[in-house]
Amino acid sequence: MAKFVFITGGVVSSIGKGIVAASLGRLLKSRGYNVSILKLDPYLNVDPGTMSPFQHGEVFVTEDGAETDLDLGHYERFTDTAMSRLNSVTTGSIYQSVINKERRGAYNGGTVQVIPHITGEIRERIHRVAANSGADVVITEIGGTVGDIESLPFLEAIREFRGDVGRQDLAYIHVTLLPFIGTSGELKTKPTQHSVKELRSIGIQPDVLVCRSDREISEDLKRKIGGFCGVPNRAVIPSLDADTIYAVPLTLEEGGLCREVLDVLQLTDHESDMTAWSQLVHNLRNPGPSVKVALVGKYVQLNDAYLSVVEALRHACIAQDASLDLHWVCAEQIETEGADALLRGMDAVVVPGGFGNRGVDGKIAAIRWAREQRVPFLGLCLGMQTAVIEWARNQAGLPEATSEELDPGTPHPVIHLLPEQQDVVDLGGTMRLGVYPCRIAPDTLADRLYGEQVVYERHRHRFEFNNAYRSLFLEAGYVVSGTSPDGRLVELIELKGHPFFTACQYHPEFLSRPGRPHPLFRGLIEAAQQRLPDSPAQAIRNQGEVTTP
């Protein structure tokens, strides 16, 4: 039977509950326990698929095609365990389910209320994750902050959950902030005390407190917090600001988080093996020479909009003993200032996914610059589509070529709507989503990078390469290096004679892991390193033995 851990947050939002949940998952897994983590989000959207990246950050796609919160990306990267649509729950999806049941007569004419119907549906979702995952421990992160009206049904549900499984089978963790007041020169505990008081008023007594701070927490302060909040001193776990999120599991392990949780759950505290993780953090903190990578996008004002892309680049740099020098480049700014002005000196260019017209011309200009300057390039989803448009306009003699998404009346729709999308009206959850196989062509860059004939990648798109133009592209020097198994859908393209130029219709960033970088990202960083002044390839170029065509 599974055990359950519930993680709440207080004092401020964005306090790091997701990283705490992911870190605890990593620590439990290092002791041999199977873990699944789910997120309860208190917004009324059914899922974040149609939400603006400026408001929500990236949409993380699971293997089974769910559009979810970016925290699920943290869960997967830290635990190296695939999550599913069951691991993402929103208030909107709960209400939708309950209302649908009411319409079907499932409640036998009863009055449908928040308690017990909404809270009961929430509890059922948590039990479902336990049953389907086979996990020893199910960790649940409750979004929002204690005191928010939106979170109340979720908090009531996890209070009721105690009656479902028994007190020895669940643990409550509360993440709070200890602010430092400069004038008094001390960390203040009052916000934490009030947050715990609010949680207690709902009927939840936390077993463990994770206290965020920017400096060391003294033993006296831990005793004070423990005394006022009703938890043992040893269960007050410091969580100091870290230089990298991958160091957080090590900090929490040192503070005793996993030990305390296992004690509450009455589980054996097996010996932990965090050797590989510690080495990973060491390598991250002691990198080799830096590579300059330009990320050209339309949402660069909010870094979380491309979170998995950035993490995938970091993973590749760790594996290649490189330091990531990431440059955020606004695609619209390229349209006004020119690609060379903003990209000169870059060792690699990445154009990630996105939707809509805004910034597309800037992305196309960036891709042309990378192609002509022979700078390593990787395009993702819309990044592949814009690479196709760039080639069509500048190399294939189709100056009016574009995507049907951008101009439905274009005479040359080199990117067009997927056939199965023709009659789709709703936006939410209707794209080509989730894992699909991709057949890799032999003797290509992709073949060298993957080393496999068939790979499985996660997708999120409505548009595809228009096969009416495939012959024209192949004749002009394009290489289709990956397709769907039936050969119809173009999944991966590359250019001959370029140091590294490839783009894919899928999202490889979702499969990258700290200790196992995705082959496309690792290949990009490896190619970027060849441009560094002391690389063998650069030395040969400097001697004039390699000339640019």
Curated annotation (Swiss-Prot):
Binding locations of ATP: 14-19, 71
Gene Ontology terms for molecular function: ATP binding; CTP synthase activity; glutaminase activity; identical protein binding; metal ion binding
Residues bound to UTP: 13, 188-193, 224
Gene Ontology terms: cellular component: cytosol
Domain Glutamine amidotransferase type-1 stretches: 292-534
Stored InterPro entries: Class_I_gatase-like, CTP_synthase, CTP_synthase_N, GATASE, GATase1_CTP_Synthase, P-loop_NTPase
Binding residue positions for Mg(2+): 71, 141
UniProt pathway annotation: Pyrimidine metabolism; CTP biosynthesis via de novo pathway; CTP from UDP: step 2/2
PROSITE patterns (alphabetical): GATASE_TYPE_1
Residues engaged in binding L-glutamine: 354, 382-385, 405, 462
Known regulation of activity: Allosterically activated by GTP, when glutamine is the substrate; GTP has no effect on the reaction when ammonia is the substrate. The allosteric effector GTP functions by stabilizing the protein conformation that binds the tetrahedral intermediate(s) formed during glutamine hydrolysis. Inhibited by the product CTP, via allosteric rather than competitive inhibition.
A Pfam short name: GATase
Active site: 381, 507, 509
Record family assignment: Belongs to the CTP synthase family.
Chain residue ranges for the region called Amidoligase domain: 1-267
Keyword terms, alphabetized: ATP-binding, Glutamine amidotransferase, Ligase, Magnesium, Metal-binding, Nucleotide-binding, Pyrimidine biosynthesis
Species of origin: Synechococcus sp. (strain CC9902)
A biological-process GO annotation: pyrimidine nucleobase biosynthetic process
Annotated binding of CTP, by residue: 13, 148-150, 188-193, 224
Descriptive protein name: CTP synthase
CDD domains attached to this UniProt entry: CTPS_N, GATase1_CTP_Synthase
Keyword Transferase found: no
